[in-house]
């Protein structure tokens, strides 16, 4: 992936893609298919978005062609796919302003750099993100010392008694991923899960201990040669107030993320439901600015990597007709275009 990173230049890009997550990387590849000069910028220090920053070792099951693929491997494959067209990719670069200047867009970064582009694609995922944390004052002192909000290295949990908190995809996916090498207890404050039905069914049939209507009340530590370490937790049933004490070595909280669109709200694009509103062409209300992936809202929106790929292709094909007004919207199939080269 290091070979993909390049220094910025002063050339006008046909399209500037804001976000180097899976959708942004696929958009860079697809722009190459349409012979568009692409620039990709991301505020994070590495490509991959949330997949790299939060759960590089997490298995993903709903990407076409892969029965199962680890997040960092998916990003590596997307980087290789995009690299054949040599897009300019700039990490640690946060775009704060976008202004129209004649036929071009001027994009300004937080550190004052200027970039020129004929079109723009916003593929910034959920914007700025941070994990929702436990609403307990005592939880702060355990962060990184037995209490985790995301998983960089799953082997940290191997051979341990792990309490997982949450009812979404991440919570159940990690329960399935860890149960072969750890003793897993999963608690959720309701009996309805927001995860995929298949994941819920698999976890219910697994050796994992599932407790619904339970929440965390307190964390108990003990002294060790290395200092204070996590020892027990007290959980309670939110219907009966019955308390239960569990011995645990680690807590993994998957309570979702707090998101913030940040400067995107000031770019003139219409915002709806804390997302960028687009039409069927993935176009925003600003001509020449498109959006794709989790950052967008439209009536049929599904927040999946699979649908994000399709949205990126739609956006790029439409942007091509702005860069080259006489170009066809539909370029034909990639197999045909490759064979002609």
Curated annotation (Swiss-Prot):
Binds 1 FAD per subunit. SUPFAM superfamilies: FAD/NAD(P)-binding domain. One of its GO terms (molecular function) is NADP binding. It comes from the Bacteria. Its EC number is 1.18.1.2. Signal peptide: none annotated. InterPro entries: FAD/NAD-bd_sf, FAD/NAD-binding_dom, Fd--NADP_Rdtase_type_2, Ferredoxin-NADP_redctase_2. It catalyses: 2 reduced [2Fe-2S]-[ferredoxin] + NADP(+) + H(+) = 2 oxidized [2Fe-2S]-[ferredoxin] + NADPH. It holds the Pfam family Pyr_redox_2. FAD binds at residues 42, 50, 55, 95, 129, 294, 335. Its cofactor is FAD. Keywords: FAD, Flavoprotein, NADP, Oxidoreductase. Belongs to the ferredoxin--NADP reductase type 2 family. HAMAP family: FENR2 (MF_01685). Homodimer. This is Ferredoxin--NADP reductase 2. It comes from Chloroherpeton thalassium (strain ATCC 35110 / GB-78).
